[in-house]
Amino acid sequence: MVQKPHSFRRKTRKKLRKHPRRRGLPPLTRFLQEFEVGQKVHIVIEPSYHKGMPDPRFHGRTGTVVGKRGDAYIVEVPDGNKVKTLFIHPVHLRPQK
């Protein structure tokens, strides 16, 4: 029997797909975004940039910025009855309006 893969990007065939016209890296402003502590952010994974990428199960979730570590932001995301702490690069974050 063959075992199914337990890799980081499994079951993400459609979730991490980019439109052909949007291929390549995003604009520099997405890399240089700044967020305040306490600000709400949406986690939207950028599949072309792998550093600081959160687990795909957090794609589309909303969290709160708690701090900064290096280039990444520390984001707390509610997951059921727990609060998960994630270290996410700003290219994978969008501010909540």
Curated annotation (Swiss-Prot):
Keywords: Ribonucleoprotein, Ribosomal protein. It holds the Pfam family Ribosomal_L21e. Residues 1-25 are annotated as: Disordered. GO terms for biological process: translation. GO terms for cellular component: ribonucleoprotein complex; ribosome. It comes from the Archaea. Residues 1-24 have a biased composition (Basic residues). The keyword ATP-binding does not apply. One of its GO terms (molecular function) is structural constituent of ribosome. Belongs to the eukaryotic ribosomal protein eL21 family. PANTHER family: 60S RIBOSOMAL PROTEIN L21. This is Large ribosomal subunit protein eL21. It comes from Pyrococcus horikoshii (strain ATCC 700860 / DSM 12428 / JCM 9974 / NBRC 100139 / OT-3). The gene is rpl21e.
